[in-house]
């Protein structure tokens, strides 16, 4: 029987703050217009998009286009709680599901990289948007 290790973050009061993931989403200009329209109708979704690490300048090599009309969408969040049932997550999941139902899954890419080594979720066509998983150890 193999032992599995889980990572659970503990806050400064001793309570668990939950399972965290890195999440990337990219899409065509046309799909980005749908994302922007959805954000205008859903406050939690808009706040989620505005919390994108590219917009906050975490990686200055990649210009942010958060909620900018006329551009492809490219979003990245580090160490976030991405759970089913959270309104913002459900909004993005709903958009991706809608695109899948229309057979337009090639117009977006999504990667969720969890804390567990085997917790990887890829939807749409991430490679078409230069989204890839790269786990490494730096010494």
Region annotations inferred by a language model:
Residues 2-40:
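Short, extreme N-terminal segment that most often corresponds to the first beta-strand
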Residues 38, 42-43, 48-139:
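Charged interaction segments
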């Amino acid at each position: 029987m193999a032992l599995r290790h889980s990572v659970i973050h503990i806050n400064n009061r001793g309570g668990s703050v939950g399972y965290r993931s890195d999440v990337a989403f990219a899409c065509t200009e046309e799909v980005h217009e749908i994302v922007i329209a959805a954000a205008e109708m859903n406050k939690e979704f808009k706040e989620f998009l505005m919390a994108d690490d590219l917009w906050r300048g975490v990686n200055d090599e990649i210009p942010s286009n958060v909620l900018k009309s006329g551009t492809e969408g490219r979003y990245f969040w580090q160490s976030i709680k991405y759970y089913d049932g959270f309104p913002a997550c459900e909004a993005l999941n709903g958009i991706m599901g809608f695109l899948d139902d229309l057979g337009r899954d090639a117009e977006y890419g999504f990667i969720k990289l969890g804390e567990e080594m085997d917790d990887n979720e890829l939807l749409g066509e991430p490679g078409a948007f230069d989204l890839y998983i790269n786990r490494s150890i730096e010494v």
